[in-house]
Amino acid sequence: MAQIYVLHENNDWVIPLRKAFAERNLPYAEWYLDQWAVDLSGLPPHGVFYNRMSASSHTRDHRYSAELTATVLAWLERHGRVVVNDGRALDLEISKTRQYIRLAREGIPVPKTVAVVGQHALPDALSAFAQGPLIIKPNRSGKGLGVRLYETPEQIVGAAERGELPDTIDGTLLVQEYIRGETGHIFRAEFVGGRFLYLVKIDATGGFELCPSDVCELDTFCPATPRGKKFE
């Protein structure tokens, strides 16, 4: 059995993996990618490498974990190692703009979106929309953090003048058309290798922090603690 390596920066998220590996008696090791040295002239070990890096890593004081992981993945792939969630997956994980472009390339419609770098460019971005409602969101984030809803473009201008727009770790904010669902729910589908696994129905009436993870650090709700029917 090949050694399994889990690349991550959040111990809470790998607890289910540790349990599953132990139950199956699978050999594994963890690479905690917060601060690390990568010898690019050396050879990586043989095995299967599972990338568990998250776009929200910087919210846990791991500012450069995603960038470090990109280097590690490139090193692994250079030497032909088996990688689950390779550099292409990480590239999409940490950039909503690239997610939307890829979706559009595959013929999947996405809401109208304008990427903005710099507050002075905000009026040009807003001019692309005739009216609201609109969403402002960071290009890189996770768990719905930093997503704000505004009913009109003028509300966004006011928020910018007051310094109330969300922080963005890569300097890019997205202005996006907001599409209200008929029931107030959104749906999250999971696929692996092109195969459909499951669909999660999420009540979105209470806000945008909608992470259906096993363990979350949301102030308003944690799916690890059952509460109503927010997640089905």
Describe every region a protein language model picked out:
Residues 88-90, 117-121, 139-143, 153-155, ...:
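Short acidic/polar capping segments at secondary-structure boundaries
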Residues 37-47, 123-129, 163-164:
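Short amphipathic alpha-helix with an adjacent loop that forms part of the alpha/beta core around
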Residues 9-112:
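Conserved N-proximal alpha/beta basic substrate-recognition cap immediately N-terminal to
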Residues 48-52, 135, 174:
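Structural motif
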Residues 46-50, 101-104, 129-131, 152-154, ...:
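Short, hinge-like loop/turn segments at secondary-structure boundaries
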Residues 145-232:
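Phosphate-binding site of ATP-dependent enzymes
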Residues 106-133:
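Rossmann-like NAD(P)H-binding beta-loop-alpha module
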Residues 1-5:
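Extreme N-terminal starter segment of soluble prokaryotic enzymes
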